[in-house]
């Protein structure tokens, strides 16, 4: 009876839960973004070996956010977390122009995964505060986002340490998930 009431309450008042994966190469800023969204502050981070998972309540959606390590040796295990995922936040270090090609390859490999076919994609072009950072148009071109035809996606310029662009991206994500596109 309690579960039935909770579901009815959620459907009337628009509460929704969503499983979100935060993916990207190592040192892109994934963990900084997770804790900026969850706690509203920058925390000191170390490379993620495995994953961090936190709940972020935003705009009547309870996001269960999984931040997965981005090191080369960990990326093959990302697929273990794909089932039941409604959205992917792909974080790119916009200042790491040497690895933008690798970021593109990993991104397009994710898009090909059957278990993520229905997931919407939010791209954070992170580290906009650093010299030489590519803007969102350049990251769009580098990742070949124009090739994405079969799903909802958006890109936002972000600076995780300053909190810039993160909530604009979360607004887009929550609105997209609420509208049933995700």
From Swiss-Prot:
A molecular function (GO) held by this record is: GTPase activity
Give the lipid-moiety residues, type N-myristoyl glycine: 2
Can you quote a single GO CC term?
Answer: Golgi stack
Q: Which SMART domains match?
A: ARF (SM00177), SAR (SM00178)
Keyword annotations from UniProtKB, A to Z: ER-Golgi transport, Golgi apparatus, GTP-binding, Lipoprotein, Myristate, Nucleotide-binding, Protein transport, Transport
Entries under SUPFAM superfamilies matching the protein = P-loop containing nucleoside triphosphate hydrolases
Subcellular location, record wording:
Golgi apparatus
In terms of InterPro entries, this protein maps to: P-loop_NTPase, Small_GTP-bd, Small_GTPase_ARF, Small_GTPase_ARF/SAR
Can you tell which superkingdom this protein's organism belongs to? Eukaryota
Functional description taken from the UniProt entry: GTP-binding protein involved in protein trafficking; may modulate vesicle budding and uncoating within the Golgi apparatus.
Q: Which family does it belong to?
A: Belongs to the small GTPase superfamily. Arf family.
**Protein name stated in the entry:** ADP-ribosylation factor 3
Q: Which organism is it from?
A: Arabidopsis thaliana
């Amino acid at each position: 009876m309690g579960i039935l009431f909770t579901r009815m309450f959620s459907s009337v008042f628009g509460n929704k839960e969503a499983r979100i994966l935060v993916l990207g190469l190592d040192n892109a800023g994934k963990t900084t973004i997770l804790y900026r969204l969850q706690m509203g502050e920058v925390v000191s981070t170390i490379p993620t070996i495995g994953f961090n998972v936190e709940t972020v309540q935003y705009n009547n959606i309870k996001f269960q956010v999984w931040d997965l390590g981005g090191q080369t040796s960990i990326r093959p295990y990302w697929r273990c977390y794909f089932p039941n995922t409604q959205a992917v936040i792909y974080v790119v270090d916009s200042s790491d122009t040497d690895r933008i090609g690798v970021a593109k390859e990993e991104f397009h490999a994710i898009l090909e995964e059957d278990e993520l076919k229905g997931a919407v994609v939010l791209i954070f072009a992170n580290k906009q505060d650093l010299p030489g950072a590519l803007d969102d148009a350049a990251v769009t071109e580098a990742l070949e986002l124009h090739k994405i035809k079969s799903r909802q996606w958006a890109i936002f310029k972000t600076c995780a340490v300053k909190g810039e662009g993160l909530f604009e991206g979360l607004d887009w994500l929550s609105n997209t998930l609420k509208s049933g596109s995700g």
